[in-house]
Amino acid sequence: MKRFIETIKNIFKIEELRKRIVYTFLLVLVYRFGCFVVLPGIDASMLAGLQQSTSEGLVGLLNMFSGGAFGNASIFALGVMPYISASIVIQLLGVFVPYFRKLQMEGESGRKKMNQMTRWLTIVIICIQGPAYMAAIHNQIPGAAFVAVNQLGWSNFWFNIVSTIILMAGSMFVMWLGERITDRGIGNGISLIIMIGIVARFPYAIVAEFGEKLSTNNGGLLLLIVELIVWFFIVAAAIALVQAVRRVPVQYAKRVIGNRQYGGVRQYIPLKINAAGVMPIIFAQALMLFPLLFSRWDATRGLAATMSNYTGFWYNFIFGRLVVIFTYFYTAVTVNPTMMAEDMKRNGGFIPGVKPGKKTVEYLDAIMSRVTLPGSIALAIISILPAIAMIFGINNSFASFYGGTSLLILVGVVLDTLQQVESYLLMRHYDGLMKTGRLSGRSGM
């Protein structure tokens, strides 16, 4: 404990790190304030229907990513989701389209071009999602809530246009906040904003669970203690999954330049057990919603009922299988053995016992296939843990922290942020946050 307190003191002794932490904290406060600012012309006291409809499914995921702003009809309702969607599209284009693949290999200049394209695509997605969100609002809340239409005499058309523009500006502002945090704050800004939205729900979830368990006289307190112990074990498992890597040794050839010798050292390529992050869970959740679109048809009503039973066997069985499939797919998209082999060859590196070129590509591909299997199974288990928690009587809000997207994002972003703080401490010759002085994070969401 004494060492931990000393480390916290050291963090604030470093002026640059202190400024970055304060800057990040202030921008996060701005974001959280905006999440509670309701769109002008809407009565905030009449949003119960919208909040209820955004509590589960993929829409619940969007509401979680926006920190509750989606269900509050906030000016930040769209949050960072348009930017994330655009980033995923550009990332996929980098695999399937030669032009984007070329940009990926151009280094910093190519990255800047792709970032600019991501911003423009974000605007296009916002232009689609903004009107769709306004249409959803009209369906979910009573007409009396639209004060601008009922009392100020605005037409629905102009109200929707103005509200869509405000949503666009809000989403772009959130994206700007994320970029500023990344550049001048601590951690990855976009990921940190999502994590803050998730963390904001935790106090409500834990208080609700405490209230339910302590109100029962048949061992409620004991059950609560068991739940918390199990939750800590699950968090530890999630940390292990995020940090787990398979290290592939790489030997670099010796080069003599003048009187100095370069290279000849052995390094490692860390291949992550879960290289896909949380994306397989998000894709699987989106796909599981498709049967609900046909719920009004008699022939498919039974299938829709099965797919809407989040604690049912078939829902979780299919959901888990989809997570495994999408883990393999997204890993194949994001991890490119061919590019890794070319980079190694270009820098004079090789894997001991493996010929450079095609054999290296095949070797890396085989390793990724082997390590992805346990990673995908572990990810599938974590993704269905919230449903299992609900079956055992845990409150829905608290159960969402037992696994799935919430837990993995929370763990991943915290590790990334701690890794940055760790690097600042070690550069100034202070003790790190961990005894080993090393912390592994994740590269992206």
Which sequence ranges carry the predicted segments?
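N-terminal cationic and glycine-rich segments that engage phosphates or anionic surfaces
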Residues: 1-104, 109-445
